[in-house]
Amino acid sequence: MEALTLWLLPWICQCVTVRADSIIHIGAIFEENAAKDDRVFQLAVSDLSLNDDILQSEKITYSIKVIEANNPFQAVQEACDLMTQGILALVTSTGCASANALQSLTDAMHIPHLFVQRNPGGSPRTACHLNPSPDGEAYTLASRPPVRLNDVMLRLVTELRWQKFVMFYDSEYDIRGLQSFLDQASRLGLDVSLQKVDKNISHVFTSLFTTMKTEELNRYRDTLRRAILLLSPQGAHSFINEAVETNLASKDSHWVFVNEEISDPEILDLVHSALGRMTVVRQIFPSAKDNQKCMRNNHRISSLLCDPQEGYLQMLQISNLYLYDSVLMLANAFHRKLEDRKWHSMASLNCIRKSTKPWNGGRSMLDTIKKGHITGLTGVMEFREDSSNPYVQFEILGTTYSETFGKDMRKLATWDSEKGLNGSLQERPMGSRLQGLTLKVVTVLEEPFVMVAENILGQPKRYKGFSIDVLDALAKALGFKYEIYQAPDGRYGHQLHNTSWNGMIGELISKRADLAISAITITPERESVVDFSKRYMDYSVGILIKKPEEKISIFSLFAPFDFAVWACIAAAIPVVGVLIFVLNRIQAVRSQSATQPRPSASATLHSAIWIVYGAFVQQGGESSVNSVAMRIVMGSWWLFTLIVCSSYTANLAAFLTVSRMDNPIRTFQDLSKQLEMSYGTVRDSAVYEYFRAKGTNPLEQDSTFAELWRTISKNGGADNCVSNPSEGIRKAKKGNYAFLWDVAVVEYAALTDDDCSVTVIGNSISSKGYGIALQHGSPYRDLFSQRILELQDTGDLDVLKQKWWPHTGRCDLTSHSSTQTEGKSLKLHSFAGVFCILAIGLLLACLVAALELWWNSNRCHQETPKEDKEVNLEQVHRRINSLMDEDIAHKQISPASIELSALEMGGLAPSQALEPTREYQNTQLSVSTFLPEQSSHGTSRTLSSGPSSNLPLPLSSSATMPSIQCKHRSPNGGLFRQSPVKTPIPMSFQPVPGGVLPEALDTSHGTSI
């Protein structure tokens, strides 16, 4: 800068020395903070004074006054001082306040006034509303075009399709300049917020965290996603840095910096400091051809101002360039005035005197200036009827991403006052924006969505799972990389009492992560603070419980009938037996009175019960039913037996061959009604919040949710709820606990269980889905959603699901969850009861037999041995043969073939020669010959003890009976006794009264006694 000043000094001195001889004298007023305006003005005068083609031999002289910023009174004083010296025109570069005061003065004195509006403190300028002249003659010409930033911003937000954004402005910016923009935005339905930024920007952001609640701070973060900065370049740089350092900015933020004056180095500083996308709107000027870049209207401009390679040009402000062109415009007017020979000499004017008349050449000079048309450093300059320069052009720059240069700026479009927008402001395809980027991913361990893989010591953790496979597929398709880490608290995300969020949702809100992936469900509460992609898997809630143990009962054969039925059957058998016994006794009495043969069976009670039991088990009976009453009883019993046995057989077959899970819990309604099993879910999870919302809703008609929530929330959830899903799964495996959680998670736990001891009861109560959570307003959401839909269409997602949830795994989830329609083979335990009954019967029979043997043995030993009254069988046979008819053939019977049985010989005294007749009244004994060769025509006679029998049976008084051999009981209750074979000996026998022996009843049997 000092070198430039030294270079300009000779020319400045030359201008000052010729001032007295020059007829061209102009005045200039600059503010004290605009040092470059002074230097550029002097440089412009020097260039024009050296150009003989414009002013010929005339030279321009000038007088410069420096005033304080925004001091209208001082500006008027200095202007009056210049007018006293005599000036042809006044060139000023001030703010709007000084410009309004100078406008009134120049209009009154008819001094042409070329006004260049300055940016206040580097902030965007607003239009200066100059006061109209009372007589309608405006001598103030605005060299700098009117502010068109409102038009550019409105077109920009329309192209970007913004519906809600915030505009930040500093104290130097006049907010009244936004009135037209706000009016048009309101008509378009745009939600625009305004916020003033103080000079101490760090204090602004610090106060946000102390004055705002978490919910308000989250909303403020959301507003920063779409922001327009009406700040100075330095202020915008500080503002963005503070936003990034305080985590209020994110990668999806879009900053729009609007300022006519910003240099290329300042733009690069903004781009590299900003997090997210940056759009810059600035004013540009058309560049001339290379061979004419320093030539303007036959005027050669100094290379310091026209050559872009010169560093000084980059240091100039737009007001400096318009100031140079204003001097060039005056020189062009002076040139035409001199050529037309219509020159008006300068006049000394006194502003204080009331009698002072305006300059009479002012109108002519003003008209000459208005008719001028030049092409200077700012392009075309000319003035319209409203005394404004209409030509202005803006450049819109946007950030780009490349692997070579990283983040950079490129030209998106231009805007000019004639054609409007030329180009597109739409964001570049997100795929190219994700290419090469590294995203931070937060996750929570949840099998099988995210699990820790086998890691190598010293290297970062590696993860696997269904969600990781989906993320890898998206990263491969979109070309981005990711760094994954676990949420510090291991939670998905729940809103706390202070309206803040924990877990993965909290990481996204605080901008520490770009996206979150795991078994995270899409809920309305979460969607209010973050964005979600399209669901990549459906979601429902299921019940994880321990499989019911198969109950093995050896007496399952009794299951077809209830205990009451078995009791009635057991009672019916003896009742019917007693009835048959009674009817049989009645029948026996009638048989004796009518000399009819009485029944041979069911004569005793236990025999009657035995017959009834045999009929019940379909084994038949031994009695012949003769009476009608007994036939009715037995017929009814047989019909009863048929129905009972048929029903038992059918029900037993169905009970044993068709197996059904003995699980009383099949739905959430069943779970809420039972009291034996406790149940719960993870505290502060999406499932927990769902049950709370449904259970506490007074409009909910289904009382199931109220019952479920009452149990889940018992003691604040501490009794039945768990802190994480792994704990809930372990608790369910132990039994007597039902874990309510995502079906996908519990199904995987059931499929991979070592003992296959748990099952899942699927009963979807919530139609949601799993998605990828992103920061609110993330530009990547639509891209992720599109790729997920493509994975679904191609079937890649189904392949990944089959990988982690195989249909045929080691554990079968359907074996205890649905009714089996196919029969199965009967196991041994199903018939164990039958074999037990048989074994018990056999053991009981053996025990009874042993008891009978022991009883009979003791009875036989206790009885006194008696003499065996022997009969001389040879005499008996001889007597019988003599009584028989002579026509009937007979043979001698061997004494050894005659067996004396069933005689109660023990009742006879040893000295008795003849047994009394009365003792044989009802013995019904018969004597038969057992000769094999004569069995077809053997003769038998009945030995009657009646008085008509006169058969002499001598009994030997001296013969003694050897020891009796006890065999077994006879049918009539006596004991069979058999004497040893003896030689025929004579024995005495008492004749039977009544004569001869009667004929035997049955001739087919031999003679027996």
Swiss-Prot record:
Q: Which cell locations does it reside in?
A: Postsynaptic cell membrane
Q: Which UniProt keywords apply?
A: Calcium, Cell membrane, Disulfide bond, Glycoprotein, Ion channel, Ion transport, Ligand-gated ion channel, Membrane, Metal-binding, Postsynaptic cell membrane, Receptor, Signal, Synapse, Transmembrane, Transmembrane helix, Transport
> Which molecular function term from Gene Ontology is one that the record holds?
G protein-coupled receptor activity involved in regulation of postsynaptic membrane potential
- GO biological process terms on file: negative regulation of synaptic plasticity; phospholipase C-activating G protein-coupled receptor signaling pathway; regulation of postsynapse organization; regulation of postsynaptic membrane neurotransmitter receptor levels; social behavior; synaptic signaling via neuropeptide
What are the binding positions for Ca(2+) 1 in this chain?
E527, V530, D531
**Record InterPro entries:** ANF_lig-bd_rcpt, Glu/Gly-bd, Iono_Glu_rcpt_met, Ionotropic_Glu_rcpt, Iontro_rcpt_C, Peripla_BP_I
| Compositionally skewed regions (Polar residues) per UniProt | 931-942
| Residues annotated as glycosylated | N131, N200, N422, N498
UniProt tissue specificity = Equally in forebrain and cerebellum.
Q: Which residues lie on this side of the membrane: Cytoplasmic?
A: 584-637, 852-1009
Q: Where is this region: Interaction with CBLN1?
A: 21-436
Residue numbers marked as site, Essential for dimerization: F73
Q: Which residues form the signal peptide?
A: 1-20
Q: Which CDD domains match?
A: PBP1_iGluR_delta_1, PBP2_iGluR_delta_1
Looking up Pfam families in the UniProt record yields:
ANF_receptor, Lig_chan, Lig_chan-Glu_bd
* Gene Ontology cellular component list: GABA-ergic synapse; glutamatergic synapse; postsynaptic density membrane; postsynaptic membrane; trans-synaptic protein complex
Q: Which cysteines are joined by disulfide bonds?
A: C80-C351, C96-C128, C294-C306
Region of interest (Disordered), ranges: 931-960
In the bilayer, the protein is annotated as: Multi-pass membrane protein
What function does the entry list? Answer: Member of the ionotropic glutamate receptor family, which plays a crucial role in synaptic organization and signal transduction in the central nervous system. Although it shares structural features with ionotropic glutamate receptors, does not bind glutamate as a primary ligand. Instead, forms trans-synaptic adhesion complexes with presynaptic neurexins and cerebellins, regulating NMDA and AMPA receptor activity and influencing synaptic plasticity through signal transduction. In the presence of NRX1B-CBLN1, forms cation-selective channels that are proposed to be gated by glycine and D-serine.
Question: What protein name does the entry list?
Answer: Glutamate receptor ionotropic, delta-1
- Which taxonomic lineage is given here? Eukaryota, Metazoa, Chordata, Craniata, Vertebrata
Its gene name is Grid1
